[in-house]
Amino acid sequence: MTYNRTIHFSDTDAAGVVYFAAFLSICHEAYENSLQVAGIDLKTFFTSSDIAIPIVHADIDFYQPLFCGDRIQINLTPTQLNETEFEIKYQVFNENNLDKLIAKATTKHVSINPKIRQRTSLSLSITQWLRSNQDDC
């Protein structure tokens, strides 16, 4: 799954490069977009009282700076780890050079019952989303 985006001024820090926390937000945008493309209603997904899917780990590696106005392509690859967890790997390229990796990130997600804060199986819609995106890879 790919997601294309322009780096905005609000994504940058005082040095004029993308701020690391803003980059995680951009990755989350790509994740949300992939859910929406798969037919998952985002409002229902993020406000469900039965299941929550928090991010429990995130990491980023930058290989060159990103500036306001840069056009990027994010390739995301979700992988189910077990019945309650999945991770998403993000690879970021400049749209003008898709051969050179600019940055990479990983987010790990865990399905929980928000009422009792215990792990629960991934929902059918997320399992289907994971399978459909793994078939693309």
Curated annotation (Swiss-Prot):
Pathway: Cofactor biosynthesis; phylloquinone biosynthesis; Quinol/quinone metabolism; 1,4-dihydroxy-2-naphthoate biosynthesis; 1,4-dihydroxy-2-naphthoate from chorismate: step 7/7. Its EC number is 3.1.2.28. The active site is at 13. PANTHER family: 4-HYDROXYBENZOYL-COA THIOESTERASE FAMILY MEMBER, ACYL-COA THIOESTER HYDROLASE YBGC. HAMAP family: DHNA_CoA_hydrolase. Catalyzes the hydrolysis of 1,4-dihydroxy-2-naphthoyl-CoA (DHNA-CoA) to 1,4-dihydroxy-2-naphthoate (DHNA), a reaction involved in phylloquinone (vitamin K1) biosynthesis. Belongs to the 4-hydroxybenzoyl-CoA thioesterase family. DHNA-CoA hydrolase subfamily. This is 1,4-dihydroxy-2-naphthoyl-CoA hydrolase.
